Every structure is written in C-alpha cells, then in structure tokens.
C-alpha cells in the first residue's frame, strides 16, 4: 500500500474537489494513459487494485507508471460517537484527483492488450476515466 513514511501533521483539512488539473495532463512516460474526467478522492487501496488489474492483464513485457500518490489523510470518528470531542483519527490516505489528470501510464507493444488492461484498471477507480494515447509531438 502507498502511504507516506512520516508527515508533518497527522490530520489535514479536506481538499477541495473543484477546478481542472494544473499539471500532469499529458502522457509523458508510457504510450497510453488513464485520464480522469471527473474529480474524486482516490484511496491507496484503489490505486493498488488498479495497478494489480493492469499488471495481471499484461503479464510480462510492459511497464506501468503511477503518477498519483495518496499523501492526504482522511479522518473518521467511530460509529455511535457523540458530536464534539475533536477531530477523528486518520482512516484512509487519499490522492485528490482533478479532471484532466493522467493517473496511470502504460507502455506495451500490443495496443489492443494495453487498452484492455487500462480499461480493467479504470473500472477500479471511483471516477469517470478515458484512455489517452501519447501524441507524436509530446515529450
């Protein structure tokens, strides 16, 4: 699971889910990528599930890049607890993903298998996604 080793503050404010992605909107490492179309919080478990779905489908010969990292804690109070008594304890680690962000990238020689692997990974994520291909002029 992806979690930070140490953080300066254990509890943070909830991040905003408005606006477009400021960077990371183009495929820069692999040939194909998964791009977010709606905003969402992606947990470390969802990132891991998508990674496993991709790598199991392509088996060997490909390379996967993960471009998001769950660096924000989300807190939760226990069930049947009265209001007050401070903020709850950290439960999940999330990555705040804005529309347009390329979250995963994949390099694989066969386009059909690569697209199927990315589709399987996109089904594990909590937002609408699309598969994008690297353009000829991109970095």
Curated annotation (Swiss-Prot):
<dbReference type="GO" id="GO:0022625">
    <property type="term" value="C:cytosolic large ribosomal subunit"/>
</dbReference>
<feature type="region of interest" description="Disordered">
    <location>
        <begin position="1"/>
        <end position="25"/>
    </location>
</feature>
<keyword id="KW-0694">RNA-binding</keyword>
<dbReference type="InterPro" id="IPR016180">
    <property type="entry name" value="Ribosomal_uL16_dom"/>
</dbReference>
<dbReference type="InterPro" id="IPR036920">
    <property type="entry name" value="Ribosomal_uL16_sf"/>
</dbReference>
<dbReference type="Pfam" id="PF00252">
    <property type="entry name" value="Ribosomal_L16"/>
</dbReference>
<keyword id="KW-0699">rRNA-binding</keyword>
<comment type="subunit">
    <text>Part of the 50S ribosomal subunit.</text>
</comment>
<dbReference type="InterPro" id="IPR047873">
    <property type="entry name" value="Ribosomal_uL16"/>
</dbReference>
<dbReference type="GO" id="GO:0019843">
    <property type="term" value="F:rRNA binding"/>
</dbReference>
<keyword id="KW-0689">Ribosomal protein</keyword>
<dbReference type="InterPro" id="IPR020798">
    <property type="entry name" value="Ribosomal_uL16_CS"/>
</dbReference>
<feature type="compositionally biased region" description="Basic residues">
    <location>
        <begin position="1"/>
        <end position="20"/>
    </location>
</feature>
<keyword id="KW-0820">tRNA-binding</keyword>
<dbReference type="GO" id="GO:0000049">
    <property type="term" value="F:tRNA binding"/>
</dbReference>
<dbReference type="GO" id="GO:0003735">
    <property type="term" value="F:structural constituent of ribosome"/>
</dbReference>
<comment type="function">
    <text>Binds 23S rRNA and is also seen to make contacts with the A and possibly P site tRNAs.</text>
</comment>
<dbReference type="GO" id="GO:0006412">
    <property type="term" value="P:translation"/>
</dbReference>
<comment type="similarity">
    <text>Belongs to the universal ribosomal protein uL16 family.</text>
</comment>
<keyword id="KW-0687">Ribonucleoprotein</keyword>
<dbReference type="InterPro" id="IPR000114">
    <property type="entry name" value="Ribosomal_uL16_bact-type"/>
</dbReference>
<protein>
    <recommendedName>
        <fullName>Large ribosomal subunit protein uL16</fullName>
    </recommendedName>
</protein>
